[in-house]
Amino acid sequence: MSIATVQAVIDGQTYPLTLSDDGYYTLKGTAPALSSANEPGGYYGVQIIATDNAGNETTIDQDDSTWGAQLCLQAYESTKPTVTITYPSNDGRINTCTPAITAQLRDNDSGIDPATLDLRINNGSKITQGAPGLILTQVEGGYDLSYAVPDALPEGSTTISIGVSDRDGNAADPVSITCTIAVTAPTISLSSPAEGLVTNQAAVQIAGITSDDQLTSVTLTVTVNGHDQGPVTVDGQTGAFALTANPEHMQEGSNTIKVKVVDATGLEAEITRTVTLDTNPPRIVEVIGVTDRVHVGAPFTIRIKVED
């Protein structure tokens, strides 16, 4: 009897082998489109089926004790995984010294190898899978990373870098961001008006100074009895500001003036002044004067009753 067919089954596909002049049946195939990294054992098992003309069949595969090691097809891919740091943002400002760093680790073929994770803060020690505060959540296409920084970072510039490889050893391009940590709130002081000021002028002058490590990014708002006084310009060098209250927003009697400053990280400071507007002149309601003649050099008395 002679051999009728020799076939190979790889990843569910059947391929015929061709008899060569040297007596070997040969398959010159193309590896599967995806990496074998996620297959059991990390390879595609190859099943060989030999059939003779009488219909007798012999089958061996990767589990064969003699030839199994020759029937393990390892396929690898060469596309780099990607890393995206989602928080903090590059050039951003945050108001906590213990931020929760988040990132997306993605690879659409062999898959992210979490054991290769390399997270560093300010070029410090390598933070890897299993570190306290580090959570890797498996999602479609990779992992979502979350890292709760356990020890307070200093205020100022902070650099965060993340690297990772896939299961075929392809390393992602290095990714890093630089952000600014600012946890000290801005300050504000008023030189005008004085607390408790009593005035007959509705156009009250409001002036003061605010301080912050990034004055050009602060937002300052002024309200009079809850009415916004419009945009306020802050000197980017000195922090000084000045404006005049809208007279229409001042009321007779007690008035509340609030000045609030908010920096780029959302930290804020506020100061309040109470000003009394009194535009009503006093009323003279009674005069008890001198009705008799008074000798020169002699004392006299005039009594006035005044209301306000």
List each model region and its residues.
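Surface-exposed, short loops/turns at beta-strand junctions within beta-sandwich domains
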Residues: 32-43, 149-157, 246-254
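Flexible, low-complexity linkers/stalks enriched in Thr/Pro that connect modular domains
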Residues: 52, 65-84, 177-189, 273-282
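Extracellular and select intracellular beta-sandwich modules with Ser/Thr-enriched
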Residues: 57-70, 171-177, 267-272
